[in-house]
Amino acid sequence: AGPQGMVGGQAIDLGAVGEQLDLATLESMHRHKTGALIRAAVQLGALASEQVDDEQLAALGQYADSIGLAFQVQDDILDIISDTATLGKPQGSDQQLNKSTYPALLGLEGAINKAHALLEEALAALEAIPYNTELLEEFARYVIERKN
């Protein structure tokens, strides 16, 4: 949660107000914010089970990182293709606030492809887990299929 986690991601976000970030910086910010939150939830659950080894924990971390980033990519996509009533916030607000987004950097189609690639990365990471990962797989799919 500190400077190497969510706080660091928030610092990047606040420092970027009115500026356009490059793709690497945008990804870093989102990995530290949403990615760190999802990583904590996934890995803490695994650690509580006391049945995972370091390799499995790393795979769950990769899963969480991919899903956290996919969530942000989908959020940026929805800001363009959805509507205010569905989103629960003003549609197009990212563009109005001059925020760096994946569609702005990659184009809408490129952002959609990025979200799908991150889903595939997440699902591939779960292959290292010898336990039932069905709920994690469903969550991963939900992240890029959600409408709000």
Name the predicted role of every residue range.
Residues A1-N148:
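All-alpha prenyltransferase/terpene-synthase fold signal
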